[in-house]
Curated annotation (Swiss-Prot):
GO terms under biological process: regulation of DNA-templated transcription; viral life cycle
The name this protein goes by in its record: Late expression factor 11
Keywords recorded for this protein, A-Z: Transcription, Transcription regulation
Organism from which the protein derives: Bombyx mori nuclear polyhedrosis virus (BmNPV)
Role according to the record: Involved in late/very late gene activation.
Superkingdom of source: Viruses
Gene of this entry: LEF-11
Length: 112
């Protein structure tokens, strides 16, 4: 049976990736481009929509090959988290603004 995509609700039998791990993955993808001398737009900021688009396409195209290895688990397939990665790649705010938005949403609608 193929693995289910992560819904971030814990039922996918796959450890969810943290935002830090996803950011590290983005950095490693950019480092791979640099290592292969494919340096066009590697210094682009995520909010620079036009320049960063090439980096986003590279990440999307290679999600099936990426694996995050940490002390938690050695076989966390990144492709299971493609929706979360797409959302993070699509954020059009600086992270401080996004953090404030998420925190205010969570604390506005407390569920615990």
């Amino acid at each position: 049976m193929p693995p289910k995509n992560c819904t971030h609700l814990g039922g996918c039998n796959s450890d969810c990736l943290t935002r830090s791990e996803i950011q590290a993955l983005f950095r490693e993808a950019i480092n791979t481009l640099k290592h292969t001398m494919n340096t066009e737009d590697v210094c682009a900021h995520m909010l620079d929509i036009v320049s960063f688009e090439r980096i986003k396409e590279y990440i999307r195209a290679n999600l099936g090959h990426f694996t995050v290895i940490t002390d938690k688990c050695s076989k966390r397939k990144v492709c299971l988290h493609h929706k979360r990665i797409a959302r993070l790649l699509g954020i059009k705010k600086i992270y401080h603004q996004e953090y404030k938005r998420v925190v205010s949403k969570v604390y506005k609608n407390q569920t615990w």
